[in-house]
């Protein structure tokens, strides 16, 4: 490198190439410095520092003169003549011309040339040494005055900007930038001009991934130069770039012009080199907050917070730009926010994670299950279900909540804390139904009819209402059957209470059994009285026999027999046997008499020999209207023949047992006559007319062997088809 012709400063090279980045760093640093001043106040050294700075500016530095033919006309230096008797301040202009292979940097001075051999005394100037060794320069010490190497006077930059055709892209990508130093150092007007005028920054894309800042920062190696020695620029961190890259086409840039920020005079003395300085333009967050006009002291400038503090190495973190924060409105009572707080707020305003967006974008799998018409139908049905005759019972929690809410609102209105206003209430419909019974239309020969069924009025299956009708109409319309069914329903409800008490007996303590037993017996006696069980001659007038004509009546008697006393049960058995022919004739349609066989068999097994003879003789008496015996009809009915076999089998057990029978006088003769009569009738009945019994006892042939000959026994065996029994001895004829 020829020092006589040109001298390349690495710091100027960085400033010229990355001017936009340094401008952004300056704005953020100025925000922190102004926050420091507002927070901690001004130092006493603020009055002494400008004097020291002016002394440093008085020492000139000679720079080599560059060829003037490389300088464009648009960037000719404007020389100002000062009338002061002090040492003249030199105007320094830095011209950067990027070429394909190399970069030429030329520096023009105001008439003085630096020799190749520089005195050690001049290099001993503290300001020069600070610039050469990368230490904070005067501009970094006073954050109120900012110069990033783009221009010293903003009027010059405005001239360049006007020549660029009001295009922000040309301002950003301008290849040649000049820097001038004037003699206006640390003037209050310049500071006020920086503080009060906040540049408008258009929103642009953040293209930092492909920028030179991300690919290489000229990192930690120290730059060598024969005239300056080892020098390292001030380390800085990569940041977002607010302006677009020069490689982006002009059509992609904002259509409105970019207004460059106004800055005060440069604070560099002639013997100082612009380095990486602390730049701190700060704009208040609220428009009604004025910016302080006092300059920052070096002591306050040194105070940095968090990631904004100087670091000896490149930090992997970089601060977000202020464009996202320009849309954020801070409350009026908040005057200023620390930059770290602004960074946190900007991070909170970023969009949510991609996983949440994916979840929100998933289609609802149940969205199309019901059509709109079906949804409306369900809503109407649910609204119908809300109707209640007792809201405090059906909707207790909401009613209690609303009562508490009304009480609270009334207290607030009474105390004057709020205006009287009727709160919103979800009204539960209250329906008061009239207690009316509408009888269904009577249809002849039916138990009732199905009424119109709705959700308000369920259907009625039976209309059991009494009507005053003549006897002929009663027989014709079957009114008697309806009356019997009504009577059976009434007795059945009473019997259900008896069964409920019986179920409770197994779960209560033994000391309470007596009480429950008395209660149960009382209810059973009431049912027995209601049935009116008594001997009768006219079967049509007996309510009990009429009850046995319907299936529900037979089932009721079968379930009631185990709860009755023995004498009550024997009376029912006797009535059934006496009127067996009547019951068999009326049971031809339903054939439900078989439900009585089990309970009656239990009663028969408990009869004595005398009682058994009395019940069996009822089957051998001829009918009043004919000469036929009930035995003839009993052989043709399953319930009748089963009942007959059960009576004969129990008699054989009594005769075969060793237990004393205690018979009365003439009981054996009566029993023998009864067995002969049954055998005679059984032998006369054809086999085809006989039915199979519910149960065939095995001791019937033993009974007949006591009184009949061998030929008659074989004939009866063939008809009854009794199982094989041990050999027996027939009675000789």
Curated annotation (Swiss-Prot):
<protein>
    <recommendedName>
        <fullName>Protein PAT1 homolog 2</fullName>
    </recommendedName>
</protein>
<feature type="compositionally biased region" description="Basic and acidic residues">
    <location>
        <begin position="49"/>
        <end position="59"/>
    </location>
</feature>
<keyword id="KW-0963">Cytoplasm</keyword>
<dbReference type="GO" id="GO:0005737">
    <property type="term" value="C:cytoplasm"/>
</dbReference>
<feature type="compositionally biased region" description="Low complexity">
    <location>
        <begin position="346"/>
        <end position="356"/>
    </location>
</feature>
<dbReference type="GO" id="GO:0017148">
    <property type="term" value="P:negative regulation of translation"/>
</dbReference>
<dbReference type="InterPro" id="IPR039900">
    <property type="entry name" value="Pat1-like"/>
</dbReference>
<comment type="function">
    <text>RNA-binding protein that acts as a translational repressor. When overexpressed, able to disperse P-bodies.</text>
</comment>
<feature type="region of interest" description="Disordered">
    <location>
        <begin position="337"/>
        <end position="366"/>
    </location>
</feature>
<dbReference type="GO" id="GO:0030371">
    <property type="term" value="F:translation repressor activity"/>
</dbReference>
<comment type="subunit">
    <text>Interacts with ribonucleoprotein complex components. Interacts with cpeb.</text>
</comment>
<dbReference type="GO" id="GO:1990904">
    <property type="term" value="C:ribonucleoprotein complex"/>
</dbReference>
<dbReference type="InterPro" id="IPR019167">
    <property type="entry name" value="PAT1_dom"/>
</dbReference>
<dbReference type="GO" id="GO:0008266">
    <property type="term" value="F:poly(U) RNA binding"/>
</dbReference>
<dbReference type="GO" id="GO:0003723">
    <property type="term" value="F:RNA binding"/>
</dbReference>
<feature type="region of interest" description="Disordered">
    <location>
        <begin position="42"/>
        <end position="75"/>
    </location>
</feature>
<keyword id="KW-0694">RNA-binding</keyword>
<dbReference type="GO" id="GO:0033962">
    <property type="term" value="P:P-body assembly"/>
</dbReference>
<comment type="similarity">
    <text>Belongs to the PAT1 family.</text>
</comment>
<dbReference type="Pfam" id="PF09770">
    <property type="entry name" value="PAT1"/>
</dbReference>
<dbReference type="GO" id="GO:0034046">
    <property type="term" value="F:poly(G) binding"/>
</dbReference>
<dbReference type="GO" id="GO:0002151">
    <property type="term" value="F:G-quadruplex RNA binding"/>
</dbReference>
<dbReference type="GO" id="GO:0000932">
    <property type="term" value="C:P-body"/>
</dbReference>
<dbReference type="GO" id="GO:0000290">
    <property type="term" value="P:deadenylation-dependent decapping of nuclear-transcribed mRNA"/>
</dbReference>
<dbReference type="GO" id="GO:0010607">
    <property type="term" value="P:negative regulation of cytoplasmic mRNA processing body assembly"/>
</dbReference>
<dbReference type="GO" id="GO:0005634">
    <property type="term" value="C:nucleus"/>
</dbReference>
<keyword id="KW-0539">Nucleus</keyword>
């Amino acid at each position: 490198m020829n020092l006589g012709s040109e001298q390349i400063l690495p710091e100027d090279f960085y400033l010229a190439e990355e001017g936009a980045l340094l401008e952004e760093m300056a704005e953020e640093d100025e925000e922190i410095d102004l926050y420091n001043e507002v927070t901690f106040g001004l130092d006493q050294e603020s009055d002494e520092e400008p004097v020291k700075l002016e002394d440093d500016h008085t020492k000139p530095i000679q720079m080599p003169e560059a060829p003037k033919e490389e300088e464009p006309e648009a960037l000719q230096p404007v020389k100002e003549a000062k009338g002061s008797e002090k040492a003249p301040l030199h105007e320094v202009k830095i011209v950067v011309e990027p070429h394909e292979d190399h970069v030429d940097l030329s520096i023009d001075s105001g008439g003085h040339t630096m020799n190749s051999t520089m005195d050690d005394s001049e290099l001993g100037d503290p300001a020069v040494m600070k610039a050469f060794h990368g230490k904070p320069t005067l501009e970094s010490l006073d954050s109120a005055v900012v110069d990033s190497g783009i221009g010293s006077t903003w009027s010059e930059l405005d001239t360049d900007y006007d020549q660029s055709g009001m295009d922000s892209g040309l301002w950003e990508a301008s290849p040649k930038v000049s820097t001038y130093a004037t003699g206006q150092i640390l003037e209050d007007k310049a500071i006020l001009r920086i503080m009060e005028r906040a540049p408008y920054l258009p929103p642009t894309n953040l293209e930092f991934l492909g920028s030179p800042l991300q690919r290489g920062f000229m990192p930690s190696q120290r730059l060598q130069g024969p005239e300056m020695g080892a020098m390292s620029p001030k380390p800085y961190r990569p940041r977002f770039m607010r302006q677009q890259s020069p490689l982006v086409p002009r059509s992609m840039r904002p259509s409105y012009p970019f207004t460059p920020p106004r800055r005060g005079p440069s604070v560099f003395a002639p013997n100082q080199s612009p380095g990486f300085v602390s730049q701190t333009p700060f704009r208040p967050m609220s428009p009604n907050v004025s910016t302080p006009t006092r300059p920052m002291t070096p002591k306050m400038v040194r105070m940095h917070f968090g990631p904004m503090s100087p670091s000896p190495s490149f930090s992997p973190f970089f601060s977000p730009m202020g464009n996202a924060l320009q849309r954020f409105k801070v409350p009026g009572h908040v005057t200023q926010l620390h930059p770290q707080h602004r960074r946190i707020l900007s991070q909170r305003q970023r969009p949510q994670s991609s996983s949440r967006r994916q979840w929100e974008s998933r289609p609802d799998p149940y969205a199309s299950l019901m059509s709109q018409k079906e949804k409306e139908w369900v809503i109407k049905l649910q609204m119908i279900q809300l109707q209640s005759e007792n809201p405090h019972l059906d909707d207790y929690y909401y009613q209690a909540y609303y009562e508490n809410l009304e009480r609270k609102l009334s207290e607030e209105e009474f105390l004057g804390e709020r205006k009287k206003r009727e709160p919103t209430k979800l009204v539960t419909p209250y329906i008061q139904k009239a207690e009316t019974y509408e009888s269904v239309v009577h249809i002849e020969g039916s138990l009732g009819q199905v009424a119109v069924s709705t959700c308000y009025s369920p259907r009625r299956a039976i209309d059991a209402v009494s009507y005053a009708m003549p006897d002929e109409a009663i027989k014709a319309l079957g009114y008697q059957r309806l009356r019997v069914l009504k009577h059976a329903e009434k007795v059945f409800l009473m019997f259900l209470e008896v069964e409920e008490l019986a179920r409770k007996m197994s779960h209560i303590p033994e000391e309470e059994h007596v009480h429950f037993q008395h209660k149960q017996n009382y209810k059973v006696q009431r049912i027995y009285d209601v049935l009116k069980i008594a001997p009768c001659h006219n079967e049509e007038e007996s309510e009990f026999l009429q009850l046995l004509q319907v299936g529900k009546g037979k089932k009721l008697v079968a379930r009631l027999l185990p709860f009755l006393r023995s004498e009550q049960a024997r009376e029912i058995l006797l009535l059934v046997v006496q009127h067996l022919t009547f019951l068999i004739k009326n049971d031809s349609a339903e054939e439900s008499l078989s439900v009585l066989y089990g309970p009656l068999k239990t009663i028969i097994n408990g009869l004595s020999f005398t009682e058994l003879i009395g019940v069996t003789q009822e089957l051998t008496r001829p009918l009043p209207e004919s000469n036929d015996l009930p035995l003839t009809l009993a052989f043709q009915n399953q319930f009748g023949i089963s009942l007959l076999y059960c009576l004969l089998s129990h008699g054989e057990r009594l005769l075969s047992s060793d237990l004393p029978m205690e018979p009365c006088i003439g009981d054996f003769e009566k029993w023998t006559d009864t067995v002969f009569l049954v055998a005679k009738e059984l032998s006369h009945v054809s086999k085809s007319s006989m039915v199979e019994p519910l149960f065939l006892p095995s001791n019937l042939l033993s009974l007949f062997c006591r009184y009949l000959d061998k030929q008659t026994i074989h004939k009866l065996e063939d008809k009854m088809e009794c199982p094989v029994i041990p050999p027996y001895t027939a009675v000789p004829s």
